[in-house]
Amino acid sequence: MESIAIIGVGALGKRHLQSMVELQDQYQIYAVEINEEIIKVLTAEFPNVNFIKTVEELPNELEAVVIATNSNIRRLLFEQLINHSTVKNIIFEKVLFQKEEDYHFVRNKLNELNIHAWVNCARREWDSYKSLKNELNEFNDLYISAIGGQWGIGCNAIHILDLIEYLSGSEIENLDIGKLENNVVESKRKGFYEFFGTISGVSGKCKNFNITCIDESVLPFRIEITTEKSRYMIDEGNNYLLVSDEESGWQWKRREFKQVYQSQMTGRVIKSIIDSGICNLSDYESSMKLHLKYILPLIEFFKANGMEENLCPIT
């Protein structure tokens, strides 16, 4: 039986694993985790998964691997993986890496070893966003705003930036972090940091976007999209979308907008990748370009705030 694996089964990694076990009748599933308490709990929950502590215990051949570790150790584990196993496909969690050199190193190794890779900015896999993208295709101009209180803009903005590229059908042309506040704070994950303020830019027919995180605020996270003929307000957490246009007299109409959880998604994505070689996630090369547009100015931002040089301590 062929094998698939996940490296890192902490909070998010567990969600990946919950979906991967849908494939347990077709593949041997391996999970790499060093935390013995996590292994103990998950072994009881997933008795058919092979839990191991090191990458070197993985099979020599793997159809697909999810690397769901923190960003600061992801390159190291990638190197251990490719030095030990022949891997056909990899899904990386975001934020990919903290150092610019890691992006190029991994890209070169993927090309050298002919490994197909994607990055898990998962909104591209939501049916609701697929439908919305089709709806927005008829418009010439988009203006997008994402705003909320204390929603973790550092680690999560890459999701919204990827979504903007997806909805606009274009790469982000410029990205401005000049409106970020100079109050870097420790995140919930030890050794990583967060910040507040606004990230803005342009992406093709998206003439302007603003991504804002407000400190000391309980404002729910919302995404608003304005076109030349309509307005949309998306509440992902409560699974609805409001839309208004001239035809409705600019009155809001409510529609279902279903959020897809990671525990419902990973198995399906892996199956699509193995069977057809494609999925809706951004490929590594495209996501690398976007990550660097985001990471490089943040390295300077963190340096200006007294942090280690040439490092972006987000995950």
Q: Which residues does each PLM region occupy?
A:
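C-terminal helix-rich "cap/oligomerization" subdomain common to oxidoreductases
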Residues: 64-69, 271-315
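N-terminal Rossmann-like dinucleotide-binding module
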Residues: 1-46
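A short helix->loop->beta-strand "cap" motif at the edges of active sites that frequently abuts
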Residues: 25-27, 85-89, 113-115
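NAD(P)-dinucleotide binding in Rossmann-like oxidoreductases
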Residues: 205-268, 279-283
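Short loop/edge segments at beta-strand edges and connector loops
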Residues: 53, 92, 119-121, 177-179
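Rossmann-like dinucleotide-binding domain that binds NAD(P)(H)
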Residues: 144-220, 285
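A contiguous active-site-proximal alpha/beta segment in oxidoreductase catalytic domains
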Residues: 64-67, 72, 96-157, 161
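Beta-loop-alpha module in the N-terminal Rossmann-like domain of NAD(P)-dependent dehydrogenases
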Residues: 16, 46, 50-109
